[in-house]
């Protein structure tokens, strides 16, 4: 009840993410209908998806304390499950180990805008030679972003260019990379689970569940046009 600010009812169904999530969603709606004695006319239909545990993601940056940390924040903020983080120049074994872990997505950063160019180009070449099979978001030095993307795309890798996660020293700009991660989530993860079909039944574009939690936390902290926020807060997502 948006006017009263209350949760009226809840329904649930077993997960069917390994087959078709529409089956589980229909079961949850049937459970809700049983509890309420009928389904109401919904003003809004909104959804999020955990994608069977979230996006398995690896980040590669220039310096661990700087661009690698910025890449890590972008990954976690988008609802990704960070399974590895690398800094400095990748060795052949590093790149092969990344490929062997079969991440869903890789965020490649490195260098401020106009700063170090060599490392991100080097790392792109090593990843290309290791035959990385997942999409790569290039979010490093904008001066060589196109060249970096060309190295990867010439190896058959799906590449997206985003704004630099650290355009200036100690200045973070992670939101564009987060948006790119979410786009990959929608395009490559949820389509495999039948969520693209389910999306037609909702008003809003699907997003990763952890990203929805973060948006909710941001709303709580900052408030809306009509309601003030709570201010600084800590959210524990269990």
Model regions and ranges:
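Short glycine-aspartate micro-motif
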Residues: 233-237
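Nucleotide/phosphate-binding catalytic cleft detector across ATP-hydrolyzing
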Residues: 3-232
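Ser/Thr-glycine-rich phosphate-binding loops at phosphate-binding pockets of nucleotides
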Residues: 1, 238
